[in-house]
């Protein structure tokens, strides 16, 4: 899947392709966060946008025949990129909401998403029952047999069809999203760079309640009768990733009751995470969320009493333990936050293991330690007799090795704007893809240049004067 961004915040033009592991590096204030938030916002909102795009087409087909059905082949075969164009056009119009920014800041923005090859959805099997409550009566059934292009809709309660919101049309749209579009657009979780503050102040932060009180106070009696006006006024003053991080950590006591499919199938990965933080997160009755350091005699600590590294990894830890599943996209803004270089290396190895069990990872980083460790995992993947001996000597596992074909790294940079017949003009902020060598790993110029400058200065200090 390829993304093209134009005039999105500090990014003038950028093209990025998501692979199993996608990394963005670059200096401060060069647009990394704009790329990250823009991609996250689309992957967070595409299902609701798709409902608007498909509503009229679905309603037309539900009115035909005793057993209405949707011919998915007729609607979508060979047309996925056309629909993605419609989705991104609508999404671009809500970028100010995604970033909690002034609308004029994104007035010239465009985003394009394309896929190279469509997947065949005909072999997919699908079945979903819609009930009035978890144990209640069935209102409708949506089904698609493997080998058939037809999504059949059996309605037991006609009232469901006439609902303006949350009715049958929305359920059909969700089914189409699962069958046709979800293979390209993964469920996404983000850990923003503001996650440390969200962890320590999570009890004090309630965006939903704050927005409600502010909205109620700003509307008159007539406007309060309009639910859409109320929702409009309740828009948060925070970017979606920050807002979602806060909402997630505020629910940890409830989320803790769930075990993710990743934790069930690969418990060794949650153990590896616990080794990084030197303990584990626990929810204790009457005490709530605590951090339990490893060791029988160690006291339990609240989040305010815990180290910054424990707080920085809180949401990632609960995501892995309670939400993660194969096919997800995990986005991490600066995974190295508050981590000692030793733990940065350990986190790089955990990220590689996540990639190898089917979780895609997208991250921004300033950490040379993290990149060097990923390079080690790429170099060890050559599996020569020599590298296998090194792997065994230093305790690397086979499930930590990285296939370079599944990795891409982009660096923020500037380039001259090219205008036909007018020569080069103003500088543009963009992304440049790094070269990846099977035997040497990733070339990251943004780190290499700084390190070489420092080494040169120190060499001059040590060897440049009179002895």
How should each PLM-predicted stretch be described?
Residues 1-226, 355, 372, 378-400, ...:
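P-loop NTPase switch/coupling surface
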Residues 190-192, 401-413:
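Extended hydrophobic secondary-structure segments that form protein cores and membrane-embedded regions
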Residues 327-329, 358-362:
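Loop/turn-to-beta-strand initiation segments
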Residues 224-246, 256:
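Polybasic, proline/glycine-rich intrinsically disordered low-complexity segments
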Residues 27-28, 34, 282-345:
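Conserved ABC ATPase signature
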Residues 364-366:
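H-loop/switch region of ABC-family ATPase nucleotide-binding domains
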Residues 345-356:
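Helical segment within the ABC ATPase nucleotide-binding domain
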Residues 258-280:
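Amphipathic alpha-helical domain-onset/packing element
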């Amino acid at each position: 899947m390829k993304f093209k961004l134009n005039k999105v915040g500090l990014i003038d033009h950028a093209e990025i392709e998501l692979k199993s592991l996608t990394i963005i590096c670059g200096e401060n204030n060069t647009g990394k966060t704009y790329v990250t938030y823009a991609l996250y916002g689309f992957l967070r909102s595409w299902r609701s946008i798709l409902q608007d795009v498909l509503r009229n087409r679905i309603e037309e087909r539900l009115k035909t025949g005793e057993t209405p059905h949707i011919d998915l082949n007729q609607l979508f075969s060979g047309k996925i990129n056309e629909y993605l164009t419609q989705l991104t056009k609508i999404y671009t119009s809500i970028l100010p909401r995604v970033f909690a920014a002034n609308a004029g800041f994104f007035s010239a923005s465009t985003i394009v998403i394309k896929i190279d090859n469509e997947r065949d959805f005909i072999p997919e099997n699908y079945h979903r029952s819609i009930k009035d409550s978890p144990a209640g009566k069935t209102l409708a059934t949506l089904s698609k047999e493997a080998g058939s292009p037809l999504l059949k809709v059996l309605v037991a309660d006609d009232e469901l069809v006439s609902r303006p919101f949350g009715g049958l049309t929305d359920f059909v749209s969700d089914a189409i999203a699962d069958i046709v579009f979800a293979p390209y657009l993964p469920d996404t979780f983000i850990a923003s760079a503001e996650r440390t503050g969200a962890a320590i102040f999570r009890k004090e932060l309630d965006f939903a309640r704050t927005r409600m009180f502010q909205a109620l106070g700003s509307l008159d009696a007539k406007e309060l009768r309009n639910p859409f006006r109320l929702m409009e006024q309740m828009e948060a003053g925070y970017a979606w990733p920050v807002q979602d991080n806060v909402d997630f950590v505020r629910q940890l006591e409830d989320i803790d009751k769930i075990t993710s499919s990743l934790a069930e199938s690969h418990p060794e990965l949650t153990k590896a995470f616990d080794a990084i933080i030197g303990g584990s997160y626990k929810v204790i009755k009457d005490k709530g969320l605590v951090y339990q350091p490893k060791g029988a005699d160690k006291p339990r600590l609240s989040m305010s009493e815990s180290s910054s590294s424990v707080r920085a990894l809180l949401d990632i830890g609960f995501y892995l333990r309670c939400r993660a599943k194969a096919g997800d996209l995990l986005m991490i803004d600066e995974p190295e936050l508050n981590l000692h270089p030793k733990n940065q290396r350990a986190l790089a190895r955990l990220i590689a293991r996540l990639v190898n069990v089917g979780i895609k990872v997208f991250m921004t980083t300033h950490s040379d330690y993290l990149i060097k460790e990923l390079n080690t995992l790429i170099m060890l993947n050559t599996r020569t007799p020599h590298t296998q001996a090194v792997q065994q000597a230093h305790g690397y596992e086979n499930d930590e090795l990285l296939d370079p074909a599944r990795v891409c790294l982009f660096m923020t940079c500037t380039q001259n704007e090219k205008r036909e017949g007018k020569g080069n003009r103003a500088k543009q902020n963009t992304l440049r893809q790094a070269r990846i060598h099977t035997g040497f790993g990733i070339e990251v110029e943004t780190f290499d240049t700084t390190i070489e400058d420092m080494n040169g200065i120190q060499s001059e200090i040590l060897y440049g004067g009179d002895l």
